[in-house]
Amino acid sequence: ESDGAHAKARADKPARSATNRQPGCCNNPACVKHRCG
């Protein structure tokens, strides 16, 4: 369980950081908040 949780967190953190860094999040399904404009 511990390993699975860590693996999921490690995989999710970089993805969120990448999407947050990108200014364009309109057509990006990986983006939590779709920002258009």
Swiss-Prot record:
Q: Disulfide pairs?
A: C25-C31, C26-C36
Q: Which UniProt keywords apply?
A: Acetylcholine receptor inhibiting toxin, Amidation, Disulfide bond, G-protein coupled receptor impairing toxin, Ion channel impairing toxin, Neurotoxin, Postsynaptic neurotoxin, Secreted, Toxin
Tissues expressed in: Expressed by the venom duct.
GO MF entries: acetylcholine receptor inhibitor activity; ion channel regulator activity; toxin activity
Q: Which positions bear Cysteine amide?
A: C36
Q: Where in the cell is it found?
A: Secreted
Q: Which residues form the propeptide?
A: 1-22
Cellular component annotations (GO), alphabetically ordered: extracellular region; host cell postsynaptic membrane
Instruction: Name the InterPro entries on file.
Output: Conotoxin_a-typ
Q: Where is the composition biased (Basic and acidic residues)?
A: 1-15
Residues covered by region (Disordered): 1-23
Top-level taxon of origin: Eukaryota
Q: What is known of its domains?
A: The cysteine framework is I (CC-C-C). Alpha4/4 pattern.
Q: Which family does it belong to?
A: Belongs to the conotoxin A superfamily.
- Name the job this protein performs: Alpha-conotoxins act on postsynaptic membranes, they bind to the nicotinic acetylcholine receptors (nAChR) and thus inhibit them. This toxin inhibits high voltage-activated (HVA) calcium channel currents in rat DRG neurons (13% inhibition at 1 uM toxin) probably by activating GABA(B) receptors (GABBR1 and/or GABBR2).
Question: Any idea what this protein is called?
Answer: Alpha-conotoxin-like Kn1.2
Q: Which organism is it from?
A: Conus kinoshitai
